[in-house]
Every structure is written in C-alpha cells, then in structure tokens.
Amino acid sequence: MSRTIFCTFLKKDAERQDFQLYPGEIGKRIYNEISKEAWSQWITKQTMLINEKKLSMMNIEDRKLLEQEMVNFLFEGQDVHIAGYTPPSK
C-alpha cells in the first residue's frame, strides 16, 4: 500500500518511497520528504553528472560531490549545472 507525503521538492502531495534509498540522516530525510517522482528526477540528474564529469563511485571525493549536489537539488532548490548541456526546450 502506498503512502502519500508532502514532497518538499515538488511542493505537493505525492507517493512516498517504498523504503529508505540512501543511508544515514540524509537518507531518513529523503525517505520522509522526497517522493518517488522527485527521486526519479534526481536519478536522471545524477546519471548526467556521473557521465559528464566522469565521476567514480569508488572515489570518496566524487561521492561527496554527488551527495552535495543531491542535497542542493532536492532540498535547496538548486538545479544541477553541467558545462555544455542545454536542456531541451518545451
């Protein structure tokens, strides 16, 4: 059974995560405040960041950068900026 939460990213009620997807306090906050839809948007941005900046998840500095970008995107309202990328026009 799905549960609805108020998603702080989307600023509306939406379906919550099925389980905590990220460890620690940030993970708890994501589980309680970020919907499946918002998480999906983050995963798309994360994939772009990893590919374009050639990040390695084996490198602790790359993981820290990705975590900071995630917090900025999900909780601070800052979009992910990738040099040379222009979003498609709607």
From Swiss-Prot:
Q: Does the keyword Iron apply?
A: yes
Coiled-coil portions:
none
**What keywords were assigned to this record?**
Iron
* GO biological process entries: cellular response to oxidative stress
Can you list the GO cellular component terms from the UniProt entry? Answer: cytosol
Pfam families the record matches: Iron_traffic
| Record note on quaternary structure | Monomer.
Question: HAMAP family in the record, alphabetically?
Answer: Fe_traffic_YggX
Functional description taken from the UniProt entry: Could be a mediator in iron transactions between iron acquisition and iron-requiring processes, such as synthesis and/or repair of Fe-S clusters in biosynthetic enzymes.
| Entry-linked PANTHER family | FE(2+)-TRAFFICKING PROTEIN-RELATED (PTHR36965:SF1)
Family assignment from sequence similarity: Belongs to the Fe(2+)-trafficking protein family.
What name goes with this protein?
A: Probable Fe(2+)-trafficking protein
